[in-house]
Structures are given as structure tokens and as C-alpha cells.
Design a protein with these regions (language model features):
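Active-site acidic catalytic loop and adjacent metal/ATP-binding pocket
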Residues: 39-42, 50, 142-183
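Conserved ATP-binding subdomain of kinase catalytic cores across diverse folds
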Residues: 19-119, 149-150, 249
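Charged, low-complexity C-terminal accessory regions
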Residues: 139-164, 205, 216, 222-228, ...
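Juxta-kinase regulatory segment immediately upstream of eukaryotic protein kinase catalytic domains
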Residues: 1-29, 247
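Conserved kinase catalytic-core helix
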Residues: 73, 82-89, 122-155, 159
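Short acidic, glycine/proline-rich loop/turn micro-motifs
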Residues: 60-66, 122-126, 186-191
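C-lobe/activation-segment region of protein kinase-like
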Residues: 171-253
Length: 255
């Protein structure tokens, strides 16, 4: 078996992390439901770290990740480094590790600091009277605008992938997680920007607030911003529920 790994330059406890990953299945505190990827928390040198073990890839991807594409763990590490260089919040990247066997990629891990935050965007969708709801939503929209201005297309810009933390001055800061699908551009068109926001909420009133705030920062009118964002949102919701119904039917026919 071949192992490849890389640590952030500031990390002083690299051998401890390699030992933790070696014993990953039998140690650590499970974080989340572990449906697709398994995330565990570990205490090390007085800090809490977060290790994500990516789902073992199928045969085609095993080969692809060895010869043609970077693994999700490596992309997460590299994209986190780029985000921080561009002044965008994300938990501090610590390391990635890949194990390869004769076929291809066997398994891979991404290690980062574990951030304790107050909420994710999902709470804004599910709890309409969440304290500071309007303020957080507007500040989140400004954060998304900053991403777009810097040419960052976060392809998994969905409700659970932005952590939100209240600062001492009463404002909010935002941190992106689940980073392995990202593209970087010189500039982003209006259509690209709106499409990038369409997976966040199905609620028309939230889309209206976001459109109002985004239009203050961009060259398009509020009316055009809302019209375009709502169109992409409705399209996404329709596809999402169509796929859900299809899965339900397939499940029914299997039984």
C-alpha cells in the first residue's frame, strides 16, 4: 500500500495525526450521522480537530483518483488553503492523507480544525423567527457576493455548508465547509452568480431579501435579481423533488 499525505506548514503534531488516522475506525467521537462520509472529532495538543473519512470510491473512481483526478480529501485541503489566501472563512486546514492499493485509491482523509459555531444557513430556512434572521440573511448575502467578486464558485453552496458564528460586536462571520467541489474564475457573470445561490432556500420571502441585498451591491436591478434568482430556485426545487419522487417509485418497485 502507498500513502500520500501533506500537512500545513504550521502543524507540529503530524505523527500524532497519522496515528489517529491509523486507528480512525476504533477511536474518536462521531460527528453527524455518518451517512456518506464519516466525520470524527479528536482532542490533540489541547485543540479539537475534525477528521473526515471520505466514502470508499467505486472501482471507476478508485482508478480515476489515482491517475486522472485529485481525491476529494486533497481537493478539500487545497481549496481551503486557497480560500484562506483569498480572505474567505473556512476551518483551518491541517492535512490530507490518501491510501492507494494496486487498483487505485483505497481511502482518503481530510483533517481540519473543528469550529464551534452558532448555526448554519439551514436554521434560517427552518426557523423563520430565528433571532436576527433578517440581519444574518443580509450579511450572508454580502458574504456570497464577496465570493462571487473573488471568482469563487462554491458548487455545494447549500444550506448545511456555511457555518455561521456571532461575533462580539453583534455581527456575523461565515465559514464554508464541504469544500471538494469548487471552481475559480477571473470573473463571474450575473447568471453564474444567481445559479450559484439557487440551492439555498425554497422560501420566496428569503429569496426576496437576498435579491434586495445583492442588488444593492451589484449592477442589476432588484427586480431582475429577484426574477432570475427565483427562476433558478424554482427550477432546482422542481428537479430536486422529481428526483426524490423517482427514488421513491424505484424503492416501491424493489419491494
Amino acid at each position: 500500500m502507498i500513502s500520500k499525505f501533506k500537512f500545513s506548514p504550521a502543524v507540529k503534531y503530524s505523527s500524532d495525526i497519522l496515528t489517529i488516522i491509523k486507528n480512525f475506525n476504533t477511536s474518536g467521537q462521531l460527528f453527524g450521522n455518518g451517512d456518506r462520509n464519516v466525520i470524527k472529532l479528536f482532542d490533540i495538543e489541547g485543540s479539537k480537530i475534525n477528521i473526515k473519512a471520505f466514502k470508499i470510491p467505486n472501482l471507476i473512481n478508485k482508478v480515476a483518483y489515482r491517475y486522472f483526478r485529485k481525491s476529494k480529501a486533497r481537493r478539500s485541503f487545497e481549496y481551503a488553503t486557497i480560500l484562506l489566501e483569498k480572505g474567505i472563512g473556512t476551518p483551518q486546514p491541517i492535512a490530507f492523507l490518501e491510501h492507494f492499493n494496486i487498483v487505485g485509491l483505497r481511502d482518503s482523509y481530510y483533517v481540519s480544525e473543528h469550529l464551534v459555531t452558532d448555526l448554519t444557513y439551514r436554521e434560517l430556512v427552518e426557523i423563520p423567527d430565528y433571532p436576527d434572521h433578517d440581519k444574518i440573511l443580509r450579511q450572508f448575502t454580502r458574504f456570497s457576493f464577496e465570493l462571487h467578486q473573488k471568482g469563487i464558485e462554491f458548487l455545494d453552496h447549500s444550506p448545511g455548508n456555511t457555518l455561521i458564528k456571532k461575533k462580539e460586536d453583534g455581527n456575523y462571520e461565515f465559514f464554508l465547509v464541504d469544500l471538494n467541489r469548487m471552481e475559480f474564475h477571473e470573473t463571474m457573470t450575473f447568471e453564474m452568480r444567481m445559479k450559484n445561490l439557487c440551492r439555498l432556500t425554497p422560501l420566496k420571502e428569503m429569496v426576496a431579501v437576498m435579491s434586495n441585498e445583492y442588488a444593492k451591491l451589484y449592477t442589476e436591478s432588484e427586480e431582475k435579481t429577484f426574477e432570475t434568482l427565483w427562476k433558478y430556485t424554482a427550477d432546482f426545487q422542481e428537479k430536486f423533488y422529481r428526483k426524490k419522487r423517482l427514488k421513491k417509485k424505484l424503492k416501491f418497485w424493489k419491494h
